[in-house]
Amino acid sequence: MSWLTPEVIDILLTVVKAVVILLVVVTCGAYMSFAERRLLGLFQNRYGPNRVGWGGSLQLLADVLKMMFKEDWIPPFADRGIFTLAPVIAFTSLLITFAIVPVSPTWVVADFNIGVLFFLMMAGLAVYAVLFAGWSSNNKYSLLGAMRASAQTLSYEVFLGLSLMGVVAQAGSFNLGAIVESQAHLWNVVPQFFGFVTFALAGVAVCHRHPFDQPEAEQELADGYHIEYSGMKFGLFFVGEYVGIVTISALMVTLFFGGWQGPWLPPFIWFSIKTAFFMMMFILIRAALPRPRYDQVMALGWKICLPLTLLNLLATAAVILYNAH
C-alpha cells in the first residue's frame, strides 16, 4: 500500500491518540459525577445513588438517557445562536487542553513547544462560554452569575499564569514533556510550593467548583448562568465541569508532581494514580469547606494569591541567578 507513507502513519496515529484521549477523559469526567455523589453520601453519613445497577453503577447511564429525552428548550426571549454556542465552548475548551498533556513519554496528542501558553489560552476561552450563556439567556439571575464568573475567572487566571512562570523558568521550556523530564530528581512541588498552592486555588476557581462556585450559587442566583438550560445543552455544561476537573488534575500532576514518573509501575499507571488522587481532592474540598462570600473570594485572590505568586517568582529568579554563577 503505497499511500501508507510515514507522514500518513503519523497522522493516523495522532487521530487514534486523540480519539482514545477524548473517550477516556469524557468517560472519567462523567463517572466522576457518580463517584462524587457516592463519596458525598459517605462523607455526610447517608446513601448516595444505589438503585440503578449494582451499587448504583448504572446511575450515570440513567442520567444520560434522562437528559437525552428531555425537551431541548430554548427560551423565546433568548439569543438562539449564542445560547446554543455557549455549552459547546464550555465542553470543548478544557477538553482540547488535554491534547497537550503527556500521559507517558510516548503518548501525547500534540507535543507543542508552547504547551503552557496553549493551556492559558484555552482557559481564557472558557470565560466566553459563561459570558455568552449569561447574556444570551436574557435572565437577570443568569446575567448576574455570568458577571460574577467573568470577574472571578479573569482575576484567577492572572494568578494561574503567574504561578506557572516559576515552573517554566526552572525547566527552561514551555513544553509540558520537557517540564516533566526536568523533575527526574526532584518534583516541582518542593521548590515551587507557593506556585503549586496558587495554581491549585486558581484551578478550582477556573472550574467554578466549590468553594469558588458563587457564579452558580443556588441560594442566591437559582443556579446562575445556566438556569435557562435543559436537556443535552445543560448536560454539556455539566460534563464540561467534570472534564475541566480531570484536565486541571492532570496538569497539576504534569507541572508539579513529576507527571508519568515513578518506580516499578508503567508510566501511564503512575499518571493515572496521581491524577485520580487530585480528582478525589476536588470532591473532598466540596464536602469539607463552606461557600464564602463573593468579596472574600476576590480578596483571597488579590490579597493572598497575588503576593504568593510574586514571592515565588522572586525566589525562583534568585535561585536561578545563584546557580548560574
UniProtKB/Swiss-Prot annotation:
Transmembrane ranges, per UniProt, are 8-28, 81-101, 114-134, 159-179, 186-206, 237-257, 265-285, 304-324
GO molecular function terms listed in the Swiss-Prot or TrEMBL record: NADH dehydrogenase activity; oxidoreductase activity, acting on NAD(P)H, quinone or similar compound as acceptor; quinone binding
Family (UniProt): Belongs to the complex I subunit 1 family.
| NCBIfam families associated with the record | PRK06076.1-1, PRK06076.1-2
The record ties this protein, via PROSITE patterns, to: COMPLEX1_ND1_2 (PS00668)
* Membrane-protein topology: Multi-pass membrane protein
Does the record bear Protease in its keywords?
no
Quaternary state and interactors: NDH-1 is composed of 13 different subunits. Subunits NuoA, H, J, K, L, M, N constitute the membrane sector of the complex.
Reaction it catalyzes: a quinone + NADH + 5 H(+)(in) = a quinol + NAD(+) + 4 H(+)(out)
Q: What are the GO cellular component annotations?
A: plasma membrane
- Which of the seven top EC classes does this enzyme belong to? translocase
Cellular compartments annotated: Cell inner membrane
* Keywords per UniProt: Cell inner membrane, Cell membrane, Membrane, NAD, Quinone, Translocase, Transmembrane, Transmembrane helix, Ubiquinone
Q: Name one GO biological process term.
A: aerobic respiration
Q: What is this protein called?
A: NADH-quinone oxidoreductase subunit H
For this protein, the record's Pfam families field holds:
NADHdh (PF00146)
- InterPro entries recorded: NADH_UbQ_OxRdtase_su1/FPO, NADH_UbQ_OxRdtase_su1_CS
Q: Any idea of its EC number?
A: 7.1.1.-
Q: Which organism is it from?
A: Sodalis glossinidius (strain morsitans)
- Free-text function comment from the UniProt entry: NDH-1 shuttles electrons from NADH, via FMN and iron-sulfur (Fe-S) centers, to quinones in the respiratory chain. The immediate electron acceptor for the enzyme in this species is believed to be ubiquinone. Couples the redox reaction to proton translocation (for every two electrons transferred, four hydrogen ions are translocated across the cytoplasmic membrane), and thus conserves the redox energy in a proton gradient. This subunit may bind ubiquinone.
Q: What is its main location?
A: membrane
* Keyword Isomerase belongs to the record: no
